[in-house]
Amino acid sequence: MKLCRIGSVGEEKPAIIDSENNYRDLSSIINDFNPDTLNFDTLEKLKKTDISSLPKLDSNSRIGACVTNPAKFIGIGLNFKDHAEEQNLPIPKEPIIFSKFTSCITGPNDPIIVPKGSNHTDWEVEIGFVIGKKAINVSIENALDHVLGFFLVNDVSERDFQKNRGLTWDKGKGFDTFGPIGPFIVCLLYTSPSPRD
């Protein structure tokens, strides 16, 4: 199951991609993909829906961010060995956790606004996860039970601001438009093979 948001900025409609790659309008079932609606109950409701009966959306429409208004946008720094080596940084013994502001979030093809004074704007492809139910002190064995789905993230950074202006990652990663996401959420419950395999 692939979920996305289609339409001009601020007017996106929630959609599901059918087996023939058509965008089907979910507006009659759900108002948007946000923290209130991205949960396992919603997935069950969508699973029971006759997708072919839903109206098609224009396939040439803008693809928006696949999630709107998330409560948090958290990243794990240097989580890929090759990237750490590329940056001449040691592999951390403990995860480096940072936040990106939710104003970073844009659609996957929307323009990125390079900040004034930037001399080293860079990007990394990451995998984002949608947590579909409350999770506190979850064991490694049960972690995937909380993951509703995943999507692509373009983690944009201004490296000079990040490394040379107080070593605060937010300075380099927090600019508006520095977090394009999507084009869609792939729901884990309906992937084959299972991510557990």
Where are these regions (language model features)?
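Flexible glycine-rich active-site/ligand-binding loops centered on an Asp-His dyad
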Residues: 90, 97-101, 142-169, 175-176
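A generic local secondary-structure boundary/capping motif
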Residues: 4, 63-65, 85-88, 112-121, ...
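Short, structured patches in soluble enzyme cores that scaffold and shape functional sites
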Residues: 100-102, 116, 123-127, 131-133, ...
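A mid-sequence, solvent-exposed acidic-amphipathic segment
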Residues: 180-186
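N-terminal non-catalytic cap/leader segment that marks the start of a structured domain
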Residues: 1-95
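Structural signature of FAD isoalloxazine-binding scaffolds in flavoprotein oxidoreductases
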Residues: 91-108, 121-123
